[in-house]
Curated annotation (Swiss-Prot):
Keyword Disulfide bond assigned: no
Identification of the protein by name: Glucans biosynthesis protein C
Segments traversing the membrane: 17-37, 54-74, 91-111, 140-160, 173-193, 212-232, 240-260, 274-294, 311-331, 338-358
GO molecular function: acyltransferase activity, transferring groups other than amino-acyl groups; transferase activity, transferring one-carbon groups
Topological type in the membrane: Multi-pass membrane protein
Protein family per UniProt: Belongs to the acyltransferase 3 family. OpgC subfamily.
Gene name tied to this protein: mdoC
HAMAP family (alphabetical): MdoC_OpgC (MF_01066)
Length: 384
C-alpha cells in the first residue's frame, strides 16, 4: 500500500468520460444504421452506419485499458480487501441499481413496442431466463465485466506488486510492433476458443450470461492488464501518449478490414472470429491514437470537464432507455435521418443532464448511482 497519491491523470479521466458519453451518439446512430436493433428508422443512413461502426470497433478496448490503469493505481494505494470492496461497490452498486430502475422498465417498454407481450407466456423457462439476462444486463454489461476483472486481477496485481518490490526498476523493453504481434496472437487465440465452442456447443454462444461473464471478459482482459502494465512502466505509457504514424495507419487499415468483414462476412462462417482478431489489434492501435490526442488536448484541469467526468457514468446509465424511447416514439415522426440524429442527441443528453442534477440532490440516489458512500461532515471539514 502506498500513502503517496499518484499525480492526477487529467487526460485519462477525460478520455474515460468521453468514451462513456460516446455511447449516446453510438446508440442513437444505431437507430439510423443498417444494423438491426430494437428500434430502427424507416430508411437507414450509410454515413451513420459508418459512424456507428467506427465507434463500435475501438471504444470499449480503450476504455478497459484506462480501467486497468486506474485499478492498479488504486491497488497500490489501498489494502487488498478495501481495494476490492471499493472497486466492486463503485461498479456493482450502480449496476444493481440500474436493473430495477432502468433496464427492467426498458424491457417492459420494448415488449409493448415490439408487440411481444402475448408471446411471453409461451416461452420456456430457459427462454424467459435468457431473454431477461440479455435485456436486464443490456448496456450494463461492462460493469459486470469490471466486477469480474477486478476479482480475477487480485492474483495478477499481487504478482505484479511483488515483482515490483523484489526486482530492480527497468524499462518495459517492448515495442509497439511487438505489442501488435502479441495482440494479434491474442485475437487468434480468442477466435480459436470461440470456434471450438461453436463446433462443440454452439447454443451456449446465444446464452446471455455466458456471453457477458465468459466471452466478453476473455476478450477485454488483455486490455485491462495492458492498462495496469502502462501504470507500472512509464515508458510503456509514453509509447501510447507519443503519436505513432504506424498505429494511425494501422488503425485505418484495420477499420477498412472491419467494414469489409461486416459487409462480406457470414455469421455461419468466420465472420465473428475474423472480427475478434481485427478489433483486438485495432483496439491496441487506437489506444495510441486516443491517448496521444488526449494527452495533447485534454491534459488540463477544468471545472466543466470535471463536471462531465463526474456525470459520465450516470448519463451513460440513463441514456439507453431514453434512446429507445426516442427511437420508438419520436423517430417515426422525423423524416430526415440527420435531423432525427441531432434531435436524438439533444433529447437524450438534455433529459439525462436534468436527471443527473435531480439525483445529486437526493442522497440515496446519489449513492446508488455512484457506489460512493456520502462523505461525513467531519471529513469535509478535515479536507477543507
Amino acid at each position: 500500500m502506498s500513502s503517496v497519491p499518484a499525480p492526477r491523470e487529467y487526460f485519462l479521466d477525460s478520455i474515460r468520460a468521453w468514451l462513456m458519453l460516446l455511447g449516446i451518439p453510438f446508440h442513437i446512430s444505431l437507430i439510423y444504421s443498417t444494423h438491426s436493433w430494437h428500434v430502427n428508422s424507416a430508411t437507414p443512413s450509410w454515413w451513420l452506419t459508418l459512424f456507428n461502426d467506427f465507434i463500435h470497433a475501438f471504444r470499449m478496448q480503450v476504455f478497459f485499458v484506462i480501467s486497468g490503469y486506474f485499478s492498479y493505481m488504486l491497488f497500490l494505494r489501498y489494502p487488498l480487501k478495501r481495494w476490492w470492496k471499493v472497486r466492486v461497490e463503485r461498479v456493482g452498486i450502480p449496476m444493481l441499481t440500474a436493473i430495477p430502475l432502468l433496464t427492467l422498465p426498458q424491457f417492459i417498454l420494448l415488449q409493448y413496442v415490439k408487440e411481444k407481450t402475448e408471446n411471453w407466456p409461451t416461452l420456456s423457462a430457459y427462454e424467459k431466463y435468457n431473454t431477461l439476462a440479455w435485456e436486464l444486463i443490456s448496456h450494463l454489461w461492462f460493469l459486470l465485466v469490471l466486477v469480474i476483472l477486478t476479482t480475477v486481477s487480485i492474483g495478477i496485481f499481487t504478482w505484479f506488486q511483488k515483482r515490483q518490490e523484489t526486482s530492480k526498476p527497468r524499462p518495459a523493453a517492448i515495442s509497439l510492433v511487438r505489442l501488435s504481434l502479441i495482440f494479434f496472437l491474442l485475437g487468434m487465440a480468442y477466435a480459436a476458443i470461440r470456434r471450438i465452442i461453436f463446433i462443440v456447443y454452439p447454443a451456449i454462444l446465444s446464452d446471455g450470461m455466458f456471453n457477458f461473464i465468459v466471452m466478453q471478459t476473455l476478450f477485454y482482459v488483455p486490455f485491462f492488464i495492458l492498462g495496469a502494465l502502462a501504470f507500472i512502466h512509464p515508458d510503456l505509457k509514453a509509447r501510447f501518449t507519443t503519436p505513432s504514424r504506424g498505429c494511425t495507419l494501422g488503425a485505418a487499415v484495420a477499420f477498412i478490414a472491419y467494414l469489409l468483414n461486416q459487409r462480406y462476412g457470414s455469421g455461419d462462417a468466420w465472420m465473428y472470429e475474423t472480427e475478434s482478431v481485427i478489433t483486438m489489434v485495432m483496439g491496441l492501435w487506437m489506444v495510441n491514437v486516443v491517448f496521444s490526442l488526449g494527452h495533447r488536448l485534454l491534459n488540463f484541469q477544468s471545472a466543466r470537464v470535471t463536471y462531465f467526468v463526474n456525470a459520465s457514468l450516470f448519463i451513460y446509465l440513463v441514456h439507453h432507455p431514453l434512446t429507445l424511447f426516442f427511437g420508438a416514439y419520436i423517430t417515426p415522426h422525423i423524416s430526415s435521418n440527420l435531423i432525427g440524429f441531432l434531435c436524438g442527441l439533444i433529447f437524450v443528453m438534455g433529459i439525462a443532464l436534468i436527471l443527473y442534477e435531480i439525483h445529486l440532490r437526493i442522497p440515496l440516489l446519489k449513492f446508488l448511482f455512484s457506489g460512493k458512500p456520502p462523505v461525513k461532515q467531519e471529513s469535509r471539514a478535515a479536507i477543507g
